[in-house]
Amino acid sequence: MNRRRAAIVLAWVALLGIALGLALRARFTADMSAFLPHAPDASQRVLVDQLRDGLVSRVLLVGIDGATPGVRAELSTRLATRLRALPDFASVSNGRTDRGGEDFALAFAHRYLLSPATDARAFSAAALHRAIGDSIAQLAGPLGDGLKSLLPADPTGATLRFLGAVQPPAQPRRLDGVWASPDGARALLLVITRASGTDIDAQQAALRVLRASFAQEREALGATAAGASLVVSGPAVFATYSRGVIERAVTRVSLLGAALIVALLLLVYRSTVLLLLGLLPVLTGIVVATAAVGVGFGVVQGITLGFGTALMGEAVDYSIYLFVQSGPEGAAEAPPDARAARLAWVRRFWPTVRLGMLTSMIGFASLLLSDFPGLAQIGAYSMVGVFAAALVTRFVLPELMPPGLAVRDLSRAGLRLERGVRGLRRLRRPLALLVLASAALLLAQRHHVWDDRLGALSPIPQPMLDADATLRAQIGASDSGDLVAVRGASQEAVLQAAEALAPRLRTLRERGLIGGFDSPARYLPSMRTQRARQAALPDSARLEAELRVAVKGLPVKAERFRPFVTDVQAARHAPLLTRADLAHSSFALALDGMLLRDRHGGWTALLPLRAPAGSPIDLARVRDALRGSGAIVVDLGATSNQLYQRYLRTAIGLSLAGVLGMAALLLLALRSARRVARVLAPLLAAVVVVAAGLVLLGQRLNLLHLVGMMLVIAAGSNYALFFDRGQRHGGITPRTLASLVFANLGTVAGFGPLLLSGVPVLASLGATVAPGALLALVFSAALSADDDGGPV
């Protein structure tokens, strides 16, 4: 091995080692967080914050089926007790007043800071007279015993009014002391995990703990609980299921694709050495691309990795071109000197391969401009992988090939393929009609071609979605995504903004436009409001004087309310309420779901809206009513679809820009608009026919179909460029034609298995690229010029 050869191989090994080290240290994930935008608008920012850190992403809906109602209730109680003691869970509710004591103690201790009724008028003699009279009247009711002990310290009923105001409007029915479904056949629990929605590892660990805890409690109850089973749903369940499905699918299709490609290469080469050498560009491309994405983005998405492993089908093309095109042209031709043949290939064919590679890179470079990291990842992976594979083919493989190694004679196959090409040329008119019919179909169905629903990309099966909907309805967990959001630089700022919105929202409730609303300021009033409420509390002398007047005509003496006077004086000088004071109460959980701090230090207050009975919320009228308040009205479901629609529009625009970039590069390289049109026409025809075929099969196109179309153009550009080269050199040679067909089969073998993945996004890619690449070759051959002098 001469110095030049040694330097090239050593440099490649060193770079591959570095890339492998970076790839092994890369963080891999299968959640969809990288498919959230870098710079969302106001509504999308609320959605993104909720998906990443909001309470909605941490909810687990739990049901216990089987056994008897009593056993289910016992299991529910024991499971809730066990889970509350574990660090994985922030809250566990099952209908028992497990936090009733903490909630009551907190509300009682801070009742005058929490109550919206705390103002100077509330402590006038007239107001006190009415309040005390109402409290005395309630002593005859079912809660009279409890109220009797509370009356001396809280004669105005501030504590119970506050607790009543924060009580959820509807809760599941109780059976044997715990929540149960309406038919009583299922015990229900609502569990909140501590881990954020994007920490799927922690969410999965919490689910394992939950299921293990249930199994232990069921075993502890013995035979009576043997028939009990656990049902769990919620975002964490969907996220962990999706990750598992994607990971298994990526592994499955990668192995199948690799096996098909290896089988194809063995069929072509009939040489283990050539097979191993031919895989080097592929493996280098995958390793270098994975390392580049890991370094550039900090995390490698499972979807990107699945896409990348399928890219083996295109990356293997380069070695096929080298090995086949540098082989003997026919039985009469003596086996060429191996090194001379490879140098001749570099001189004759590398410019065409290089132009095809650059064309592919230009197309995918447009995706880097997307502010959606997932789309940019796919673009970066494709660019780096194709570039690395091509460079290894150009510089490394010729140095590694043994001097006497040559590919078997493929001239017979090439000659048969030549006859096929001539037959395809005779079918130009029918193929043109096929393209026109496909274009007409797409034009006629233009309003139904694209599926702009985010759910279309979900791998979650319908039975899981149905089970979630059933649990959600049984437990009364609202699936309404309507809320009002205000953002600010501090917690105090957003709490004040939430308080300012309350009068407008109460007006909407009175008008019947909404059924109600919640607010973080209900559980933690702003400091400004708390100080105002403290300032409204009277001193002892004044309060005692008002009480003496207030009790006139009532069957009670003013002296009985000395605890009331003492507590009011204590509240006047007590420290203001903070988030830390709410710990160990259900108020903390409610507050944390509505008061969010983002990763940049900003704050958001969310005010969930409840729909009026029997009708949805008219969000347009709500927006009109809140105009000028600085608040935004968000429909999370609609916003998620709008986010995907924006994603899709961005991808379409960038793809068109990529095609224009390809055309510009080809024009610069070929210096002929006619030749550029001849190169691009078969690729665009293939895309049109594939898209129409998918629509005819009842599919609506999604984001990954679009990325697949880009891949069809990228892979097909090599075919079209070789046919263009053949026209300028008297026709395409049989071995070149054979190399194109085998390269095409490699692409089909790489992407075809994606159809079997069971993951919509991967299946969409396979359904586009596999037939699209085949059609790109067919159209390139059909539109190639007739031979006019024989190949050279």
Regions found by a protein language model. Name each.
Residues R428-V551:
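Juxtamembrane segments of multi-pass membrane proteins
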Residues V295, L311-G327, W350, R354-R412, ...:
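Transmembrane alpha-helices and their membrane-interface boundaries in multi-pass membrane transporters
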